[in-house]
């Protein structure tokens, strides 16, 4: 089952592209009409020979098409894909193997994380802390219950292979001087029922090779196994013993047996006889409490969905800082049985405050994801088993474990190579930073679009030739699309994004702060560029090729320095911070500067340029740099005001 829902980024970019496309096409048509009208009404084109008329009309058409090329963000999808691809490669170094490209950004929009307990919050290094025996006829039977009713192994170095819980039992047996391999060789397996999250127990029918005695061995969740046991073999204090173990964050396991003559498991008769109860410790990962706190401070709700008991899950939640005894109550946790029995309406009223879902089945996890999505949440969910595949598919972001099954990995969007919750928090930071970098790219592009459109409109009505040629526009477009995308995509993630709340699903990718910046910088560009054209028209009557070369170079270097404004947008630090380590960003700057120099010095008639003197280059570079210096001064002032407001609080 797949949700088939578009990602938040995809919806926003589609809407933005359509809006910009409509405006760009409308303005290009307007420019074409103005140019044709001026040619016929002002320049007397109607009386010119038809070959000249055709040439002028085609030239006007080419200018209009070039305007569409500049205004319409046809390179936006490619640029975003480039950003996502670069992020995928870099996230791999932080133990996040991105399997589906869109997941890079979607993690930044996540509002709820439904996480497993074992291995993700804990170390998955289980160790049997205590085994309480109950009326065993001999110790051999307990050893067989551990060794034969298991699919795990110990390697040559004594490390467990297979299920971690079963591996912990084998390690305990070895510490008790038991030989699990010899015990296995001493019995014949007649039938086996492997563990499943639905049954919550495992059963193996064995026959001893020496005595031909047959036993059905069972191990699993205490409440399931005890329900099948003879009450006479179950001591009254066992519930208190189990609860005491669980309150210490121990996983509990019950072992039972029954002598039988059956050849198949279903033929064996109940009730069983309780053999022992095991308490298994699985310590919390050291880095998890800080990661959970970081996610919670970022406005992300964390919910534990586990097959363990409520007491065990609650203690783990307490250790990682998710559960507060002074604030949280039974309303903040549910068992799988309660969850299954509740209606969707009841759950919708409760899941917002739910923190723990214990004794949960995979279908419970999928249902929880579906209900959270109905409430408008963007949900990330973890899973490592084959049965987790539906929930991984249905979630906005499915997170499989590096130690999980291939089915779970194929169904997921990201694989956590180290299985740790810390990597989930890191993925959120990457996703938010990626979204911010995409905003910076759009900010850069729309600022240039705004200035270019206004300059083109003004140039089309002025008594002068177009300030930029078609070839110059194409070079500007390369800067706006490919090079700027590379520069913004190369920026490293920033921890500051984890101090913000998740963005709203319906929020426009163009924020109010971006609109203010676009309007401010774009207006400055327009004033500078139109001021140059107006001054030349006033002083010389018609701009010379040298003056238009200066105009073209000024336009490009305004973009050059505006890259710093885009880099510093919402950065929380100076735009120059860390620039020495941003090799891609520096390379892009060098390519723009070198490319512009080559075009001006060698472009000739193709680019309508003439070589400039070093003094002219110095004036252009120096004066256009004021756009970056001014932007940095404004951002520094805002940061100081923000810090003052925080101190006042």
What is each PLM-predicted segment?
Residues 1-502, 509-510, 523, 538, ...:
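Conserved cytosolic headpiece of P-type ATPases
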Residues 34, 528, 558-561, 595:
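Membrane-embedded alpha-helical transmembrane segments of multi-pass integral membrane proteins
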Residues 480, 525-526, 549-564:
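Generic alpha-helical transmembrane segments
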Residues 517-532, 557-558:
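Alpha-helical transmembrane segments of multi-pass integral membrane proteins
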Residues 534-543:
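Long hydrophobic segments that form regular secondary structure
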Residues 544-548:
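Transmembrane alpha-helix entry/boundary detector in multi-pass membrane proteins
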């Amino acid at each position: 089952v797949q949700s088939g829902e578009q990602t938040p980024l995809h919806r926003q970019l589609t809407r933005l592209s359509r809006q910009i496309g409509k405006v760009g096409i409308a303005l290009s048509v307007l420019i074409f009409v103005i140019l044709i009208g001026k040619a016929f009404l002002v320049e007397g084109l109607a009386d010119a020979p038809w070959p000249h008329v055709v040439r002028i009309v085609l030239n006007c058409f080419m200018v209009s098409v070039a305007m569409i090329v500049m205004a319409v963000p046809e390179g936006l999808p490619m640029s975003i894909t480039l950003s996502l691809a670069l992020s995928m490669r870099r996230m791999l170094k932080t133990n996040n193997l991105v399997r589906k490209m869109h997941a890079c950004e979607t993690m930044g929009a996540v509002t709820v994380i439904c996480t497993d307990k074992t291995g993700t919050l804990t170390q998955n290094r289980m160790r049997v802390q205590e085994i309480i025996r109950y009326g065993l006829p001999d110790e051999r039977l307990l050893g067989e219950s551990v060794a034969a009713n298991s699919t795990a192994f110990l390697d040559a170095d004594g490390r467990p292979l297979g299920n971690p819980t079963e591996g912990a039992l084998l390690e305990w047996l070895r510490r008790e001087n038991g030989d699990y391999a010899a015990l296995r060789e001493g019995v014949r397996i007649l039938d086996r029922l492997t563990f499943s999250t639905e049954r919550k127990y495992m059963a193996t029918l064995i026959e001893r090779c020496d005595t031909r005695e047959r036993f059905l061995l069972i191990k699993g969740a205490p409440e399931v196994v005890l329900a099948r046991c003879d009450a006479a073999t179950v001591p009254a204090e066992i519930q208190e013993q189990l609860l005491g173990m669980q309150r210490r964050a121990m996983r509990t396991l019950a072992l039972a047996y029954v002598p039988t003559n059956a050849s198949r498991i279903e033929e064996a008769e109940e009730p069983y006889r309780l053999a022992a109860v095991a308490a298994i410790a699985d310590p919390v990962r050291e880095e998890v409490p800080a990661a959970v706190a970081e996610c919670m401070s970022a406005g992300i709700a964390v919910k534990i969905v586990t097959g363990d008991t409520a007491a065990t899950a609650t203690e783990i939640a307490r250790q990682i800082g998710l559960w507060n005894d002074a604030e949280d109550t039974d309303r903040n946790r549910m068992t799988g049985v309660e969850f299954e029995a509740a209606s969707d309406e009841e759950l919708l009223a409760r899941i917002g405050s739910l923190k723990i879902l214990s004794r949960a089945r995979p279908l419970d996890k999928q249902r929880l994801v579906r209900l959270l999505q109905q409430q408008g949440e963007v949900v990330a969910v973890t899973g490592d088993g084959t049965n987790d595949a539906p929930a991984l598919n249905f979630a906005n972001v499915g997170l499989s474990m590096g130690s999980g099954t291939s089915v779970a990995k194929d169904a997921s969007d990201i694989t956590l190579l180290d299985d740790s919750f810390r990597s989930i928090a890191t993925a959120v930071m990457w996703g938010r930073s990626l979204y911010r970098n995409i905003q910076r790219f759009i900010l850069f592009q729309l600022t240039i679009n705004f200035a270019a459109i206004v300059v083109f409109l003004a140039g089309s009505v002025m008594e002068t030739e177009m300030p930029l040629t078609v070839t110059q526009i194409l070079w500007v477009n390369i800067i706006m699309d490919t090079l700027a995308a590379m520069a913004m995509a190369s920026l490293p993630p920033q921890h500051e994004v984890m101090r913000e709340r998740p963005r709203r699903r319906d929020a426009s990718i163009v924020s109010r702060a971006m609109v203010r910046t676009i309007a401010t910088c774009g207006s400055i560009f327009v004033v500078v560029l139109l001021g140059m054209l107006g001054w030349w028209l006033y002083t010389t009557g018609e701009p010379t090729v040298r003056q238009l070369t200066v105009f073209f170079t000024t336009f490009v270097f305004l973009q050059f320095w505006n890259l710093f404004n885009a880099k510093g947008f919402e950065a929380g630090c100076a735009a120059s911070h860390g620039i020495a380590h941003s090799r891609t960003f520096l390379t892009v700057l060098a390519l723009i500067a070198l490319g512009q120099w080559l075009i001006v010095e060698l472009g000739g008639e193709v680019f309508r340029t003439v070589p400039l003197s070093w003094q002219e280059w110095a004036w252009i570079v120096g004066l256009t740099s004021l756009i970056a210096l001014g932007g940095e001064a404004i951002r520094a002032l805002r940061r100081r005001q923000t810090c003052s407001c925080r101190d006042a609080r």
